[in-house]
Amino acid sequence: LHEQKVTRVFAISFSFSFGLLITGTSWVYVSLHNFGGMHPVLAVIATVFLSAIFALPPAIIQTALAKLVSSPSRRMLIVFPVGLALSDWCRGWFLTGFPWLSIGYSQIPLSPLSNYAPLLGIYGVTLACAFCSGGVGYLFTYLSVNRANPKWKVGVILPTLILFLSIVLGSVRWTEKISQSAT
């Protein structure tokens, strides 16, 4: 979303969300066609329509944030991560739309970012992942444009801090065993 026009931000965000949703909702087609007896073409149309409807809010959120923030670096470091986490949260809570497709679940259980889950929940993991992605994107963008500009270091520092804090959080015992279970 770096240095993109607002209309292009909408198209990119919608395409990403639609791609995520269409792959995560293939079971809707199976339910409609195999179990509901719906004609295959109509089942495909219904699944595509459902995915497109659920892809609109993330695209609208990212577009609105991009309109508010014109700085390309702030878009990468703040707008993209906040917009991604906010749209995941909105889809999961307000639209009852497949919360298991949240980006944060891609980090559970093996990523160090999963250490944010006990404290911030899955949407906090999504936010941490998005901030790391924004930082890495920022790093590569600045390195490809102007290596002499020291601003590229932000792209290293942000993900490093997030990962370091995650490792620290991983050393905390969030629960403790009270007693042995009889079963």
Regions found by a protein language model. Give the residues of each.
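Membrane-embedded alpha-helical bundles of multi-pass enzymes
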Residues: L1-S179
